[in-house]
Amino acid sequence: MALLQTSLIWAVYAIVVAILAAVASVFIYTYQTPRDRCPSVILTCIVAVTTLLATVLLVPVDVALVSSTINPALGRRQDWATQSEVDRILLCLKIVYYFLYSLDALLCLIVIPFIYFLYEEYDEVASETEQQSFGQRFWAAFKYTVSFLAIVVVLFLVGFFVPVAKDGDGGGLDYFKHLLTENRGERALTFALGLLITIGLCLYVLYTSTGLALFPITLIKEGPSVISPTLKATTAVQLCSNRERQRQLEGRCRGNPGLLSSKDRRELDTLVREERTLIRRQRLADEAHGKHQNWLMQLWLKFGAIFRPFQLLSGVIFSLLALIIWISMLLTTIDKAKNSFCKQRCGYILGHINVFNPINWVFVQSAKIFPVDYVIFTLLVLFLFSSSIVGISAVGIRFLWIRIFQIRKGHTSPQALLLATAMLMLIILALNYSTSMILAPQYATYGPQTFCDRELSFSEKQPDCSRDKHLIRPCSEVADSLAAKQVCTPSVVSTFLNRVTMNFPFFGAIFFWAQFAFLGIYLLVMVTALLHSPKLDERQLDEDAEEAEEESLLANTRGRAETTWEDITSRLRRQNEVDRAGA
């Protein structure tokens, strides 16, 4: 029974990971620019996003496995759940967690920078003329990546030595063996993870809070777009007025622009440029309305119009969900600030829940019927992940106030896609902490586990509360009952995250106070978005129209060049055949 139950839990996790790979692929293919597709960049981004989401969504599996050892109705362990069996489950989970966390760090700090530099080193002309080989690109990218490799080594060395600073002889091999037996290697990974979560929290506070406020509102208050009939009519009127003014100027000079004054010539040149822009804008609007499009695109546009009311409904639902998330985070942070038994000394760890948290309650109740809690947790994580993407799209990739890259659907360069993926990886690490320790702390620590709070008689191996249901209590971290210590098993993720804040209290303080910054920015952005009416970015629209026109011209030129090349090669082939026949 135990083997079947654990196998089913892992099977559900495998299905979820496959779904995550599909979600990551859709995200990457939606945002990348079609003109600059790079297979190595696409594959790296998909693997990175899938791995991080798989790390976060291991939490319900962790909770389900440790909770499966308990009979919550009786507050005692299952008959098969011996201590050795529980230790085996925990060891398996630890191996998976350490593998995923190490892979996350490797992808974020080594692989993504390497692929970024590898793409930057690519020179299309030099590659076609065989002046640049793949080995040269690889070596140049590796030289730039060495600095990131050094950062990783320094991170692990700091985490390896700082917690166990000792005097005396510590430079030999025996000392390293002693550190490993004391599990200092695990502390090094803990320090590296704590630092990455700290960096991720800065991005999480800025981007996820912004996206959490904007995502539902953009679904409800959809701004004017190129599909708007009003914009199409306005463009037609502007184009008509422009051409009328051009005719007036051309009539004044009778077709000879040299007869015009310098002021009129400048006006005519401006009108000609404006006419080209308006024509491109009109063509883009026609394509958005399905004109000159294939039947599949026209069908998609019709479906979009039909499902517009459902978009409004989903916006309202997401707004309520975002508000519940905000309230749950606020309640937990207040609870931690008031009732944490160790305050800043251990990162405001909460012994047990003192304030009702709606999201935590939903997860604890749904965890009694696996995989209901897994479905809800997955939807919550994907909602926060989508909010992070919306936040990055709205704010852009910036250095201080300078926008370096813009993230837009169908217009994101490979470099921007790699940077956005690295940012999302760090954000998801911070999200792992927030969902486990802030949104649903009781669920992520013990799930639905309970224990029988009564004295153990000499003839009993476990307390029996079958007749005393009122003595069955939920497990908590400060339960001082001997029965609780024998029965309750904390999840691996809660143990690992609490170890970060216990061993390095400054990380815990940053993690805690960053939540208040998140709540404040969300409130500010939400109020601003409600009061501000969305406007159409005409400059961006004109750039999109110009880019589409360039793409069309390049495609036509490429087609003509290929046709010409085929004609030349076929002519040479026929000439060679004639020469051979004559010979």
UniProtKB/Swiss-Prot annotation:
Region (Disordered) residue spans: 541-562
Primary localization class, coarse: membrane
Annotated TM spans: 8-28, 41-61, 95-115, 145-165, 188-208, 312-332, 347-367, 375-395, 418-438, 506-526
Species this protein is from: Aspergillus oryzae (strain ATCC 42149 / RIB 40) (Yellow koji mold)
Name of this protein: Probable lysosomal cobalamin transporter
UniProt-annotated location(s): Lysosome membrane
Alphabetic keyword roster: Cobalamin, Cobalt, Lysosome, Membrane, Transmembrane, Transmembrane helix, Transport
Assigned protein family: Belongs to the LIMR family. LMBRD1 subfamily.
GO cellular component: vacuolar membrane
Organism classification: Eukaryota, Fungi, Dikarya, Ascomycota, Pezizomycotina
